[in-house]
Structures are given as structure tokens and as C-alpha cells.
């Protein structure tokens, strides 16, 4: 009998070690996995391990609910909410350990940028601010936002925030003296406004779109010129009006700005 065959036969008689099961809790606890499967739960901080970053498919992820980029979708009407429901609660976007002053920005639908600032305290206190909408598409603006990182003030701020949008968005910053004066002036001239009540019901997105339309209105030279906002909705530049108030789906600017009407 060849020596190699004899050795193989003897080896087959030896007891084999028990098969290692990747589903056994003791194995998963001793061998942290990088696969986002059920086995990952054993190394998650919720299981008693030290809180901190843990790997999922080779990407460092903080514990807790993750902040996801909202994919803009064309709404059926501009009165759709400015941000999805999952972005309405600040704790839902908390990322690991943060210090007061940390800011997280999130692109919402139609190119709006929602900024959350952590104010400290047990449980976390957040303030949020909506900026925009921005000119350009989501794909064009996203790289700029990613390169800006977390800052106190976003470098994407292109001009002042929409009038009235801050309070409508719920950041609670209140009115400044200038805004209060504008509001009083609008109320005083309210009865004199003869603008048609055309467009969707008022809402945060509508106000933002109206603000965007006012900027475009300043550029529109020909009466009746139509422009399309970042959300894909058509606005028509019309007559010049002295009133300055936001109405259903349109805004009348100063005498220097054309009237803007939501078309489709």
C-alpha cells in the first residue's frame, strides 16, 4: 500500500472538528461581521457593545436612525409638503455623538435645503431652517452640498430665505423688524390688491416657489413670459403691481417686480 494512501486512510479515521456555524450567537459575538445581515445585530451597540461606529459593507455608520438624502420627486401640485414626514422630527436624524453647534443639511424636494442645528441638552434640541428653492437641478447642486460639509452656515446660501417661509417651516425664529414692517404694509394694501386668486392652496412649498418666481420675475422683460421653477412647475410673469403680499399660488412683488402666477 502506498505510503500516501495509508496516511489518507488514517486521516479519515480521525474525528473531524465540529463544523463552524455562522448562525451561532457565540460565533457572531466573537467574529464581528461586515455584512448587513441578521448577524450584524450582535455587534450593534444596541446589543450591549460599546457605542460607536460599526461597519456595514465597509462603510462607517453611526448608531441610530440614519440621515438619508431625500430624492426629489415632482409633486402633483406645489402645495405638497416641503419635506417628507420622516424629516419633521429632529431626533430622527441624530447621528451618533454630536456637540452643540453641529449642523446637518439635507436636500429636500424641489431643491430646497433643510438645515438642522444641534443646540445641546438632554435628548437634543434642534432648530431647523429651510433655504431655497435653488436654481439648478438636484444633481447639479448635490456635489456642492457634499463638499461643504457640516458648517454653522451653509456656503450654499444664495440670497435671503423666502419671506414667511421660516415661520411656516417651524424654526420659530420669529419676525424681524423689517419683516414685520413688510407684513404691516401688506396688510394695509391688502384691500387694494386686484390680483387674481389663481393657483393651489397656500403652503410652505408654494411660498418658496413664489419667492423663486419673484426672482425670475425681475429677469422677465416681456409681459406674459413663462418660466419653470426647480419643481418643474410653470409660472407666468404678468402685470406690475404695487401690492406686496403672498396669495394662493402667486405673489405680487414691489413695483419693480412683475406679477407671478402659478400656471401648471
From Swiss-Prot:
It comes from the Eukaryota. Residues 29-40 have a biased composition (Low complexity). Residues 1-52, 123-207 are annotated as: Disordered. Residues 188-197 have a biased composition (Basic residues). Coiled coil: none annotated. Residues 144-154 have a biased composition (Polar residues). This is Putative uncharacterized protein encoded by LINC00482. The lineage of its organism: Eukaryota, Metazoa, Chordata, Craniata, Vertebrata.
Amino acid at each position: 500500500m502506498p505510503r500516501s494512501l495509508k496516511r489518507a486512510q488514517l486521516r479519515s479515521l480521525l474525528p473531524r472538528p465540529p463544523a463552524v456555524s455562522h448562525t451561532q450567537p457565540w460565533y457572531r459575538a466573537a467574529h464581528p461581521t461586515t455584512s448587513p445581515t441578521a448577524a450584524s445585530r450582535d455587534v450593534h451597540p444596541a446589543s450591549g457593545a460599546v457605542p460607536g461606529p460599526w461597519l456595514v459593507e465597509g462603510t462607517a455608520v453611526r448608531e441610530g436612525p440614519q440621515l438619508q438624502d431625500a430624492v426629489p420627486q415632482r409633486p402633483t401640485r406645489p402645495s405638497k409638503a416641503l419635506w417628507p414626514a420622516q424629516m419633521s422630527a429632529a431626533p430622527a436624524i441624530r447621528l451618533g455623538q454630536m456637540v452643540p453647534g453641529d449642523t446637518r443639511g439635507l436636500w429636500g424636494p424641489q431643491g430646497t435645503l433643510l438645515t438642522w442645528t444641534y443646540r445641546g441638552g438632554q435628548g437634543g434640541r434642534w432648530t431647523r431652517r429651510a433655504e431655497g428653492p435653488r436654481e439648478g437641478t438636484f444633481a447639479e447642486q448635490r456635489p456642492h452640498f457634499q463638499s461643504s460639509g457640516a458648517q454653522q452656515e451653509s456656503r450654499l446660501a444664495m440670497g435671503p430665505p423666502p419671506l414667511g417661509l421660516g415661520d411656516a417651516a417651524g424654526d420659530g425664529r420669529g419676525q424681524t423688524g423689517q419683516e414685520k414692517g413688510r407684513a404691516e404694509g401688506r396688510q394695509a394694501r391688502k384691500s387694494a390688491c386686484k390680483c387674481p386668486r389663481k393657483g393651489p392652496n397656500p403652503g410652505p412649498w408654494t411660498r418658496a416657489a413664489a419667492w423663486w418666481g419673484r426672482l425670475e420675475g425681475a429677469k422677465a422683460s416681456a409681459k406674459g413670459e413663462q418660466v419653470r421653477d426647480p419643481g418643474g412647475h410653470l409660472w407666468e410673469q404678468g402685470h406690475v403691481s404695487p401690492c406686496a403680499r403672498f396669495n394662493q399660488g402667486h405673489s405680487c412683488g414691489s413695483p419693480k417686480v412683475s406679477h407671478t402666477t402659478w400656471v401648471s
